[in-house]
Amino acid sequence: MISQLPDPLICHILSHLPIKDLVTTRVLSTRWRSLWLWLPCLELNSLYFPDFNAFVSFGDKFFDSNRVSCINKFKLYIYGYDVGVDDPSYLTSWIDAAVKCKIQHLHVQCLPAKYIYEMPLSLYICETLVYLKLCRVMLDDAEFVSLPCLKTIHLEYVWFPNEANLERFVSCCPVLEELKIYGCGNENAITLRLLSRSLKKLSINILKSMCDFHSEVVIDAPLLSYLKINDNVSERYIVNNLESNAKLDISLPFGLLDFDEASVSSRTDSIHSFLRGILKVSDMTIWVDTFKLICKYSELESLPRFGYMSRLHVTLCIYDLKWLPTFLESCPNLKSLILVCVGDNDEMLSEEMIQFGSSLVPECLLSSLEFVDIRIPFRGHLEVMKLVRYFLENSAILKKLSLDHDIFKKLFTIPRRSTKCQVVFI
């Protein structure tokens, strides 16, 4: 019988039950009446309780001051109540207790309509915390931060009192490896600085619909191997000390809505600084607006050479294919290209709209490009045939060309410069 098992094993089993089922185990026996209170993991959702007082009462029992056992994981979801939501004392006491019980994984998500909770000061000096996820709360202006074991931080719609607060919070995590920032900010912030000697993965997702934010982001993380940016607010990005094997995923229009010559000219310094900071990336994913912006920039200034890049994933509008050779010219050692074209299936392009330039054959096509994967929604367009012909006729060592539809039987009649090339229909 399960009751004959030792308490630690029973607690482990109970930790996999939903909270509403967990509480009902109290009626099984006298021994089980308080056993659930000693679980090492708890997921507490205010929606499971009839009112605010019942929710707080339940949490207070679990975080009793006499508790001596450790708490490994605590997930807390707080949704708005009409009464009591503006009193954060219960949240402070729970997190204080969790810190004392050597919490390792903490996830707090608050959705009250009129109140933003501040995280208690005890959180900033938790010596055992390994994983932290915060959603719709405020980081306090803590003068002292010490999080020696924290490896993962996810921040969603988190507010901070000043721009130095988040910088200090991140830089005081000596073993931090992963940081995700989603819609965080401060209406008075100008520059967001992310400085870390241990950070390996960084994702920034900030859109105008989320909140007002800074105009500049500075990233200095010498061990960074993955950087994802989806930001249509910030006007300037400075990336320092990026690893030579880093992967980059960017959707970054530098705060521009239009890409006319005057608008792009106003961002030439910002684009130049950003491109110089990412020269060592080996794997780049670039999205529609960013590709268009960089190509518009190339008409004003020469693109730098991405000598370390071996893989490129580009999503672009078919109208922008004319810039592809220019962009590829800046990737002399490219081995793999994934090309995704988006647009209206009924679009027809004039001869001027798609120019691959018979005289321009990028260096990578002659010396390094081995794999091309074309994913395009258009059916039977002459322009698509031009695109495929361009790669088949000019890629000297191409090994495989992959297409996502089966209407290109004419491709077999196109002469190939590479004798090793395969044409694969998906």
UniProtKB/Swiss-Prot annotation:
Coiled coil: none annotated. InterPro entries: F-box-like_dom_sf, F-box_AtFBL13-like, F-box_dom, FBD, FBL13/AtMIF1-like, LRR_dom_sf, LRR_FXL15/At3g58940/PEG3-like. Pfam families: F-box, FBD, LRR_At5g56370. This is Putative FBD-associated F-box protein At5g53635. It comes from the Eukaryota. It comes from Arabidopsis thaliana (Mouse-ear cress). PROSITE patterns: FBOX. SMART domains: FBD, FBOX. Residues 1-45 form the F-box domain. Residues 353-405 form the FBD domain. The lineage of its organism: Eukaryota, Viridiplantae, Streptophyta, Embryophyta, Tracheophyta.
